[in-house]
Amino acid sequence: ARAEGKEYKTYVVLSHLGIDTTTPVEWRGSTLAEALSNYAPLKGKRVLVLDGHSHTLHTATYGDNVTYNQTGSYLNNVGRVVYNSDRVLSHGVISHDEAKKNYQVNPTVKAMIDDIQAKYKADSSKVVIENSPVKLSGDRMDVRVRETNLGNVVADALLDYGQSAFTHKSNLAVTNGGGLRETIAKDKPITKGDIIAVLPFGNSVAQIQVTGQNIHDMFVKSLGSILQVDESGKTVLDENGQPLLEPSGGFLQVSGARVYYDTTLPAEKRILSIDILDPETGVYKPLNTNGTYYLVTNDFLAAGGDGFTMLGGPREEGPSMDTVFADYLTRADLSKYAVINPNSRTISISSADFAALNKKENAADPTLNPLAPVTPSTIAKD
């Protein structure tokens, strides 16, 4: 095996795939490790796969040359792999308690960390708005499973920004539920620290041009999880009697679109209809699979991350998502987001109930129009 024209004996793969059962087998870190062990150019080479995502404490060997290691989460363990140029001598983890017991604190490093923490605390305590009138849920069993008010307000912030920031007005906005990491409390100030806790990854806003077919395929992927079951094996239902999906970081929170779906159907057939907001008229119109649309999202999804291979290509980029979100919060009427699971944009419904609906939903509805509540963005467009 060669890289940059040079021969190497050892390869270290840093991945974030995981091994949990909700991840398709072909996307798992263990599948990658096994594939590398069977890859002829790597025979006789040493390969270390250092993985994450599923928060699993797991170590394994594949074939005679691939070692897989994952150390759990939240610094509970530190991975340790000892090897020489010929073979791995040992691999495993050092627990947090073991590290505290057997390793001494480096005072120079501690002083550096203390200084950084003090500066961060001072900056993150700055108040963005004095009071949040609603709880915005970032619970993983909300944002990774179905439409939530936090997902709506973040997606609305993206769509609002996309009305004037790019060459073309954005038609719709999406962000992955796995990128929303914390709840914003009711009846308390919202600080910069709260916003960073919700959006901790430093993603920037990005817009890409997509086809209607890309949008359809994107939502098929978003809504493709297996169904939740309880400890007795019984399917877990939502308030309307529809099966809930298993949590997925790729579940999309949406603005500027309404997606009706039936979770009782096979994953590839769940979507019943998709309507897209016309930013010029405020009217929702049926998706044209041959049409061209402008999608505003985060740079991770815009590049096709989280398995959204139908996305990607050239993009325009803006500032950080947390900056755009903070600006939107200062102008939005948050009382409109009081319902945690509104079921108004990604709408879980039975096929029978959908067939019986009066199709008035295609008319403009200001209660669902994410562009109505706020004035145009004043945030810097560069």
Walk through the language-model features, giving the residues of each.
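Catalytic centers of hydrolytic enzymes
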Residues: 72-382
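Functional cores that coordinate and move charged inorganic groups
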Residues: 1-118
